[in-house]
Regions:
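Charge-rich, well-structured scaffold segments of protease-associated domains
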Residues: 1-138
Length: 138
């Protein structure tokens, strides 16, 4: 189980045997549909620290801040691609619990998601399982 984020999307992915498909779908639907209820200030602060450490690690590598300079030189003031996906330390420090919850409600629902299943599964079963696990999520 892993995930990545870029300018236009966040993706979560799992490579599992077909015998673990129900568990994987349950975990992803739980993240999408029920995570918001357990995000509190303590968890936000913990994850903020994790992200800040990731940012510092990137910046402390040789040429670690070059990409920021390239973005500023490539995109006009106000363009969303002008800054890195991770944001600035000031952005990270300023994010509130309300900000995170609103972002989650706006962007991380089933209406904005694409589910891809590949492997030992037929289309009818995939559709049935998608409805079972994600159908109740707005």
């Amino acid at each position: 189980m892993n995930g990545t984020t870029n300018f236009d999307r966040t993706n979560y992915f799992q490579n599992v045997p077909s015998t673990a498909l129900d568990l994987a779908l349950w975990m992803e639907s739980d993240r999408m549909g029920h995570l918001l209820g357990v995000i509190d200030q303590a968890r936000l602060d913990e994850q903020r620290g994790v992200v800040q450490n990731e940012k510092r690690q990137g910046e402390n590598r040789p040429y670690g801040r070059v990409f920021e300079s390239v973005l500023r030189a490539s995109f006009p003031e106000g363009h969303p691609y002008r800054w890195t996906v991770i944001g600035s330390m000031a952005d990270l420090n300023a994010a509130t619990l309300d900000d995170v919850q609103e972002w989650f409600r706006t962007y991380y629902g089933a209406a904005n998601a694409v589910l891809v299943l590949a492997g030992d599964i037929d289309v009818a079963t995939a559709r049935e399982k998608a409805q079972q696990y994600f159908g109740h999520i707005p």
